[in-house]
Regions:
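Active-site-adjacent structural elements that line small-molecule/cofactor binding pockets in enzymes
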Residues: 1-191
Length: 191
């Protein structure tokens, strides 16, 4: 996931990393687990994601999140109490832009996104969701929720049930996948 100010563990620019991976690969899908949307301008994200999806020739999966670190919100001057509203506003605008609606209109002149994403109308979207409000928000958009690596299997089962109920309440179709993050360690040492 996107991670700022974490020393060697930092990943502050996941889209740039994926662009490098897209240039070196041809068949694997490429994705973010959680690009932090509330700290970014939705037009910039829509443009960068469309370009990345073109470079990746439709292999992009865009995982989005709201963020959780107080330091992150302080540095980017975002009120953390507004993160859900900003997320909803930004993603709604991005979906509109990717669908071909004008980015901006003044008088008789309209501005549109170019190039559009390779996938139509936009890349596959996953929304990181670790609590009831986030699960409802993912369901409202009809996007798969990206389960936390911190959830136990019992919590995962409970959250999946909440998510499915929220999908039904939002009159959304069950997505084909439920992405789950898990941390694994690979070593030659059996210990």
């Amino acid at each position: 996931p996107e991670n700022h100010f974490a020393g060697p563990a930092a990943l502050s620019a996941p889209l740039i990393l994926l662009a490098a991976a897209a240039a070196r690969t041809h068949t694997i899908d490429l994705g973010t687990t959680s690009l932090v949307l509330p700290i970014r301008h939705p037009v910039s994200v829509a443009e960068e994601v469309a370009m990345l999806d073109q470079i990746a020739q439709g292999r992009l999966i865009l995982g989005l999140g709201r963020g959780f670190s107080e330091d992150l919100f302080d540095v980017f001057e975002v009120d953390p109490r507004q993160k859900r509203a900003l997320f909803k506003q930004s993603l709604t605008r991005m979906l509109s832009i990717w669908a071909g609606d004008p980015i901006h209109q003044k008088d008789d002149r309209a501005l549109y996104l170019s190039p559009r994403p390779h996938q139509s109308p936009y890349p596959r979207l996953w929304i990181a969701a670790f609590g009831p409000l986030a699960l409802k928000q993912a369901a409202a958009f009809g996007c798969p929720y990206l389960a936390s690596p911190m959830e136990t299997f019992a919590e995962l089962s409970q959250n999946l049930a909440q998510y499915r109920a929220a999908l039904k309440a939002a009159d959304q179709v069950q997505p084909e996948v439920v992405p789950v993050m898990r941390t694994i360690f690979i070593t030659e040492d059996a210990a």
